[in-house]
Amino acid sequence: MSNSETSKVTGSIGVSQWPRTLAAWALAVQLACAPFSLAAPAGNGSAGSADAAGSSSDKPVGKDAAVNDVVLRAMQNELARADADLTKTEQAPYYLSYTVYDQDFMVLVGSYGSLLQDFAAHRRQADVAMRVGDPALDNTHGQSRPSGVTSGALPLGDDQDALQRTLWELTDREYKRAVPALLNVRTSSAVRAEEEDKSPDFSKETPTTHIGKASAPPAFDHAAWSSEIKRLSGEFRKYPEVYFDIVSLTVQDANARMVSSEGSAVVTPSASTRLVMEGQTRANDGMELLRVETFQAPSADGLPSEKELDAKIDKMAVDLKALREAPVAEPYDGPALLSGRAAAVFFHEVLGHRLEGHRQKDEEEGQTFTKKIGQEVLPKFLSVSDDPTIKEIGGIKLAGYYAYDNEGTPSQRVDVIKDGVLKSFLMSRMPIKDFAQSNGHGRNQPGLMPTGRQGNLIVTSTEKVPEDQMRQRLIDEVKKQGKPYGLYFDDIQGGFTLTQRSLPQAFQVLPVIVYKVYADGRPDELVRGVDIVGTPLAALTRIVTTGDQQHVFNGVCGAESGSVPVSAVAPAMLFSEMEVQKRQHAHERQPILSPPGTPDSATPNGQNKPAKPEVNQ
């Protein structure tokens, strides 16, 4: 969840949690196009999977590739010059890297049947990462970690001298940050108690070269898509209950280049297209209610058809009308069934963040699983892996795919839990006790230091029942416990988790569509205003069985190293016990006036009101 204290609160965010005014929403779309990384979702023809990650070398590589790439040539030339000159200083860096993020993007935003935003831009940003001291103890240790990178805008053209001068200036700034930070680290280490985890600050990895070549992007029909965005947003006008709507299309072509003093040279092109449709309404008690549908593909050609999108909007409007009339849920503790998407978000928040490597070393963290390697942490029928090398599952593109992480390490599948037993963590180049190497999960948004992060978190099960039988299994569990009803969580918008030991080790998952499923055979009842809450160690042991189909949740996850695209994949899951609480909500009244053009709006000169549009059920 978006939070200023990202070191304390970690979570998934999506467009569904963005600002609720047109101007703020449009600005959020524009700002969201800025960050991207080596880990950005790749489309067909972009950087290949890590199965063929490229060659390795013990000396500088990629010189030939730089001949026709002015930016890469400028990076390598300035890196060599800076490395040679800084070696002569009293505090010579032992590691230096440049990463340049190049991004061309186009954004269309529509609302109420008209375009709100239509813009394109080219952005280029450079990160200069530097480490002084030695791998055992350097300037990035502990709370001084931000001193390891300085970021700034880079000239957009191919003027090599201008590019090198900017890199030179950023390198100078970074060196002047890193040296005092190292002094502070050494002083602090001398007066503080000995740390429990004495692992080095930086791992030694084999230098890698991978020079990906971007395919020509598919032709994009700007006029046709402008018209389509207006048409789609105009569809919401058929529904008076929907008082806010946004439809946005973001098309991005990106190129990330990374070179290091160790000899790595990694260039990864990527392409992605993302369509987001959102509708919002408000219940009589002031609770804001929303429905969001998100689609992504390598290009606009891979998005759903016009007919499919119209059907989604109709379903969103029907859901919103039903939510307005639904009762508010009461606090509850009992059997619950999570759809596959809901279970995917649940695992991302409750488990995934606690398996990120740096959290096992940081003494401010709760370290829920740090000393549980080799122990059972889930039911034996469940296994969990994180595999950023996979581009899609069941025909659905995965947002968490990447070929190389932000430290230039090839992405890898990591089996973190096998048959319920904890086996590993998601590692960047920050070693922890018993895990000395990266496994390709060092990720960050530009301007921030990488940490171990999730990519494609995948939950598999050997205790499966057909998905159409899961509801009956829920009813059986409700009857077994003597409860009047259980809860079914059909759709979800995101969540967040608390991981620092100064805070409760708790999580909160934010459902959108929730039903009461009665044991006595009454029809399911839609409810609203409910959040899933709990603590990880208790919640994860209460999974009874799972469905037999995998479901995908694509989103954007925010943590210390910024916002990165992620996917979570899981089957539907039955829990013997799940706790929910009432959701805090606003108490603003309904709009005083009806929207113009709706059946209840004022009509001048005594004209008849237009017929009320029908909602397809």
Predicted region positions:
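His/acidic/aromatic-lined binding-pocket segments of jelly-roll/cupin-type domains
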Residues: 414-415, 516
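C-terminal, non-catalytic macromolecule-binding modules
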Residues: 422-477
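Bacterial N-terminal signal peptides
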Residues: 21-37
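Hydrophobic alpha-helical bundle architecture
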Residues: 400, 460-538, 554-561, 565
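A glycine- and small/hydrophobic-rich beta-loop-beta segment
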Residues: 389-398, 403, 411, 429, ...
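N-terminal secretory signal peptides that target proteins for export/translocation
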Residues: 1-18
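Active-site bordering "gate/hinge" segments
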Residues: 38-404, 409-412, 418-421, 434, ...
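Residue-level structural signal for beta-strand termini and adjacent loop
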Residues: 292-294, 428-430, 529-530
